[in-house]
Regions:
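Glycine-rich anion/phosphate-binding loops
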Residues: 8-23, 58-63, 108-110
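Hydrophobic beta-strand scaffold residues
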Residues: 32, 79, 166, 363-364
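Preference for extracellular/luminal or secreted protein segments
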Residues: 158, 179-447
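Second-shell residues forming the walls of enzyme active-site clefts
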Residues: 56-220, 227
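Flexible hinge/switch segments at interdomain interfaces of large molecular machines
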Residues: 34-43, 84-90, 237-245, 430-433
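Short glycine-enriched loops at secondary-structure junctions
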Residues: 31-41, 81-87, 172-173, 200, ...
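Short, small-residue-biased leader/transition segments that mark boundaries at the very start
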Residues: 3-4
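Acidic-leg catalytic submotif of subtilisin-like serine proteases
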Residues: 20-34, 281, 290-291
Length: 450
């Protein structure tokens, strides 16, 4: 997902990430990457875009997505922006239904369409059309955007002047699967490549019959074939060489790739509250640390990294835990004057455990979940000594959250979305480095291979 890249202010790092992704694609013989997501995630209840989006501000989404796409294309990999004309403001998933986006043309132009327009103006190569019903853009056909000539041909290709390859989203998805002539309809709408049509043989037979009946012209088919062939040449497929698998894993997971990934995570962790400048911790000799991870059943990378800096007693709380053990774990926390709570779950049962663990205390809360989950914890946020958003529970996100607490890295991240009534997009406090951090040789300007 893009969640940890969207709170990074330095777009050159996102370009480097895209470039490294392009290098890895090329090494594996991949010519096309169905990224970046250009959807503006303005609906916190969105079940399918969410953390895949670069945020909820159209200009920010455009800037970061274009940086990533340019990085990809600098390595000869086609970027494919998606899901035109915008899947961000819906609470439904087009894998399972046909979402409806009910906004005016003016709203769509200023929000959903803006990143796509900037992407097209930047001269990038690929676009994916989404399975969405958008009455303001097409009130005549009642077709999803991916199958609508008004949206694909008239809007995308004529008005916005997109000249690259147009792909449909997967046609087997519920948002498009109910149309029996989906392949014919998609081609007539203006798409060039059809992804995963239902029963391809049947769809091909239908296209052959359509050619015989003049429902679609040979010229349209030939133009699309020539367009695909042109891009095959551009992407080097006229000089195809089999991929050598020797040393593949080592070359993919090289030190530079790790350096970029680590930089992305280090710059994304966001400090939202820091009462009394508690973070980074000082006077360690006066502190006793208890660190409970909630929503997991095994000791975490977060707890391991905390123990690299101080004597920290780890514990766990999770839904389904024996009541006696739950009570004992919560009671034990009162022994420590510094309580760190790592939050790994948005489940109701685990939220209640966090609230119980916080009662009567001034904890440091560290969230390894979506920022939208903060709403579920709003009752306990005022009592927290500090609040950190790490966005996900990958090992690096956990390790850098721990380093931030102890001053091994500086706090730089900015919240990429608005959390209604709590935090505004762009919020994020800064802290200095006060202790040594943990890094790879490449991050220190050295070469680990020497």
């Amino acid at each position: 997902g893009d969640v940890y890249k969207r709170q990074i202010r330095n777009d050159s790092l996102i370009y480097a990430y895209g470039k490294e992704m392009g290098r890895q694609c090329r090494r594996m013989g991949i010519q096309v990457n169905f990224a970046p997501v250009l959807d503006v995630n303005t609906n916190p209840q969105n079940p399918v875009i969410g953390r895949r989006s670069f945020g909820e501000h159209p200009e920010q989404v455009a800037r970061k997505a274009i940086a990533y796409a340019k990085g990809l294309e600098s390595e000869g990999i086609m970027a494919v922006g998606k899901h035109f004309p915008g899947h961000g403001d819906t609470s439904e998933d087009s894998h399972h239904t046909l979402p409806v986006v009910n906004h005016s043309k003016i709203h769509l132009a200023k929000n959903e369409l803006l990143p796509f327009k900037h992407y097209i103006d930047a001269g990038l190569s690929g676009m994916m059309t989404g399975h969405l019903l958008i009455p303001a853009l097409d009130s005549t056909t009642e077709l999803p955007a991916s199958l609508s000539p008004v949206i694909v041909d008239t809007l995308l290709q004529q008005k916005l002047r997109f000249r690259g390859l147009t792909f449909t989203d997967a046609l087997e998805m519920k948002g498009a699967s109910s149309y029996p002539d989906q392949a014919l309809t998609a081609l007539l709408a203006g798409n060039d490549i059809l992804l995963k049509p239902i029963i391809p043989g049947t769809q091909i037979e239908r296209l052959e019959k359509a050619l015989e009946n003049n429902e679609i012209s040979h010229q349209i088919i030939e133009e699309k074939c020539l367009k695909v062939l042109r891009y095959k040449y551009i992407l080097g497929l006229n000089r195809y060489r089999p991929i050598k698998t020797e040393n593949l894993i080592e070359e993919l997971n090289n030190p530079n790739a790790e350096r970029i990934t680590r930089q992305l995570f280090a710059r994304s962790v966001t400090l939202l509250e820091n009462k009394n400048n508690t973070i980074p911790f000082s006077d360690l000799e006066k502190r006793t640390f208890g660190a409970v991870s909630v929503g997991v059943k095994a000791k975490t990378s977060f707890q391991n990294m905390l123990q690299n800096y101080a004597e920290v007693t780890p514990s766990l709380l999770y839904a389904g835990m024996k009541p006696a053990l739950t009570n004992e774990t919560i009671q034990q926390l009162s022994k420590y004057n510094t309580i760190i709570i790592g939050i790994y779950s948005e489940k109701k049962e685990n939220i209640e455990l966090v609230k119980r663990a916080c009662k009567g205390k001034r904890p440091i809360l560290v969230f390894f979940v979506s920022p939208y989950a903060l709403n579920a914890y709003k009752d306990i946020l005022p009592d927290a000594e500090a609040v950190i958003m790490a966005y996900e529970s990958t090992p690096l996100a956990q390790e850098y959250a721990a380093e931030l607490l102890f001053g091994g890295i500086e706090a730089k991240g900015k919240l990429p979305v608005n959390i209604q009534g709590l935090y505004a997009m762009g919020e994020g406090l800064k802290t200095p480095i006060t202790r040594l951090g943990y890094a790879t040789p490449e991050e220190a300007g050295m070469d680990s291979r020497i």
